[in-house]
């Protein structure tokens, strides 16, 4: 039995009320904070574990020493084969650049950029998303986690701790090489924070591309219906 009520809430102007902004929603904030905290914790824990266990001895990082030598590296070590067929190794690297080692020796710029990006992401979450845009909130939280995880390393150690090396023993065919001279299929070493950043961006791009059309107001719907009826009447006449 129908109650006769409309399933939508209407504003005084006849506009069908949309999802409220995310900043008004406790659920949205909880999603953002919980996912971000989990991601940051996972990233920092994985880095700590790797630098304590991958080499023969725990690698102690001295911030002043690393800042004084832009080519500072952990002591030589064999690394750990994680997946067979040379798919993944754990190999310790200190990255003075951005994601996958891009832009070396620009520490201050990356710190300022990361702080700006984190602030912008929070603003976009608060006023640029709706309360029920849960997937977007997860994507933004993953970006925050990745950015903050690497920012922590830049401030505390002077560089970012990386240890994930995909396809370490796979070479490019036909003696090809990358601009830096590397012949590996994937010569970059990365970390969990980098993965979180890329996953977050992928979620946001996907959700933005599949976003539904906004709900129309009662007035615009009524005007469309009137135009359709007028067209039918003209055809019938």
Give residue spans per PLM region:
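Alpha-helical transmembrane bundles and membrane-interface segments of multipass inner-membrane proteins
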Residues: 1-237
């Amino acid at each position: 039995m129908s109650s006769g009520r409309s399933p939508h809430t209407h504003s005084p102007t006849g506009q069908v009320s949309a999802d409220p902004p995310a900043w008004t929603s406790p659920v949205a904030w909880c999603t953002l904070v919980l996912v971000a905290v989990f991601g940051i914790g996972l990233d920092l824990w994985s880095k700590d574990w790797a630098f304590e266990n991958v080499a023969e001895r725990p690698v102690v990082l001295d911030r002043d020493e690393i800042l004084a030598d832009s080519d500072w590296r952990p002591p030589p070590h064999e690394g750990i084969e994680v997946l067979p067929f040379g798919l993944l190794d754990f190999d310790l690297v200190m990255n003075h650049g951005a994601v996958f080692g891009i832009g070396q020796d620009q520490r201050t710029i990356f710190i300022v950029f990361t702080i700006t990006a984190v602030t912008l992401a929070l603003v976009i979450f608060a006023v640029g998303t709706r309360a029920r845009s849960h997937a977007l909130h997860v994507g933004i939280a993953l970006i925050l986690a990745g950015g903050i995880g690497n920012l922590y390393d830049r401030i505390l150690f002077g560089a970012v701790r990386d240890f994930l090396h995909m396809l370490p023993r796979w070479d490019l065919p036909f003696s090809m090489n990358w601009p830096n001279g590397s012949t590996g299929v994937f010569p970059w070493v990365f970390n969990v924070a980098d993965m979180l950043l890329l996953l977050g961006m992928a979620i946001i791009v996907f959700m933005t591309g599949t976003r539904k059309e906004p709900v129309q107001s009662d007035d615009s719907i009524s005007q469309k219906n009137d135009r359709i009826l007028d067209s039918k009447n003209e055809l019938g006449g």
